[in-house]
Regions:
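PIN/NYN-family metal-dependent endoribonuclease catalytic core
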Residues: 40-48
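Short, mixed-charge aromatic SLiMs
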Residues: 35-41, 146-149
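Local cysteine-cluster metal-coordination motifs and their immediate loop/turn environment
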Residues: 8-20, 47-67, 114-130
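Mid-chain, well-packed structural core segment of small domains
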Residues: 61-99
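N-terminal amphipathic/hydrophobic targeting modules at extreme N-termini
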Residues: 158-161, 170
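Long, hydrophobic N-terminal alpha-helical segment
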Residues: 1-38
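Cys/His-clustered metal-coordination modules, chiefly Zn-binding fingers
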Residues: 84-149, 153-159
Length: 170
């Protein structure tokens, strides 16, 4: 089984603490978090609405199809692709291992994969969660050290791309 996620939700899942648009959205997101924490399911990248969006699709104000959200997905896809050293496209599967989550959270805290966050209504909440070392997150574990100065993480070994410009593994 897989959890279907659109690219910008790769970022949202890093700071999810149980807040959301509606109670139905939060209940659904909590179910997705439980599935990811069980470690038995991979993430499959999708274009458009995903398993997290299901909690909103029945709402009259669902924004999952808006052009701004599609652009947010593209910015997230590009920044996470650069971090991971591979091109992420629909159908790509990722495993939410502890190492994957730490790498993503370190990059998020350092601002290296936050391009998609511009204009998001949740940005201040996510800033606070990242600054706290990701305390209270519902997917994975918080970072072991509180990131008082997130920029110091930009040289962390886990942030090095898997593949260099030669295309070979480091």
């Amino acid at each position: 089984l897989t959890v279907r996620l659109r690219p910008h939700h790769l970022l949202c899942m890093l700071t999810y603490v149980g807040k959301g648009y509606t109670s139905g959205f939060v209940e659904n997101y909590d179910r997705v978090a439980t599935r990811l924490n069980a470690g038995e399911e991979d993430i499959e990248l999708v274009d458009g609405p995903d398993d997290i969006c299901e909690g909103l699709l029945c709402e009259s104000h669902a924004h999952c199809f808006n052009e701004g959200v599609v652009q947010r997905d593209e910015r997230a896809r590009l920044s996470v692709s650069a971090l991971l050293g591979e091109t992420l496209t629909a159908g790509k599967r990722l495993q939410t291992t502890p190492d994957f989550l730490v790498k993503m959270r370190l990059a998020f805290a350092a601002g290296e994969i936050r391009q998609a966050c511009r204009g998001c209504q949740w940005i201040r909440l996510c800033d606070r969660i990242a600054a706290s070392g990701f305390a209270g997150v519902k997917i994975g574990e918080p970072l072991p050290t509180v990131a008082k100065d997130a920029a110091r993480f930009s040289k962390h070994p886990m942030l090095r791309p898997k593949y260099g410009s030669s295309g070979r593994k480091h």
